[in-house]
Amino acid sequence: RKFTTDTEEIECNHHLVDRAWVCSLELEEISSYTKSIARPEGWQFVIDLQNRTGTGYVYSSKYIDDDESLNRFKSWNCNRKMITEPRLIKWKPNILKNPWSDNVVTIGLGQGFIDPLESNGLYLIVFSITMLVKCILKDSSPEAYNRTVRRVQQNNSNYILHHYMLTQRDDTPFWKHYKNLEAPKNVWKNFYDNPNQYTSLYPDAIWAQLGLYFDIPKP
């Protein structure tokens, strides 16, 4: 038996967020939507569940240290009772280059992690399993599987990155970093180049909606 995992990664250096403080708060009124709040060095999510509220501060360790970020996180929740102590989660934004290596297939968080967005992660898990079954049934090569999954992961990375880059906020070094990446032309490029000709997490219409929402001029 041979169990080999390829640990070669594709680094995603433009993505700055690499930490998150998370905790549970006592439930008050239930909102029917998730709140995403821009913060000076990242963003905060607030999700109301049946018996608690989950919240977290996603930030970049390049621009704020863990102690200061914890103090800010607590201050934003000062009017709410914490029912769990804040917990620090760390990661390095990356994509695994070859998730299928010999007789090992990496699926889930080990396959890549960019940003703590649960719906994206769930989709990538389902997609990876579905694609693996198709490849096995068609006797496709691991290289074909890796190429397809890697492309979808990179598409996910690119789409998330554009949400940071297209914002109008530039009042802190964190947001200025993204502002200086000059992303707008890439929005329509993703829409115009080879439309609907390859597997993507975000279809062309989604890129078009992104361009329209942020009022990005067409090339």
Which residues fall in each region the model found?
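Predominantly flavin-linked oxidoreductase catalytic cores and closely associated redox partners
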Residues: 1-80, 129
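Long, low-complexity C-terminal extensions of enzymes
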Residues: 134-219
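FAD/FMN-dependent oxidoreductases across multiple families
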Residues: 50, 59-167
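Generic preference for hydrophobic/aromatic residues in regular secondary structure cores
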Residues: 21, 32-34, 44, 86, ...
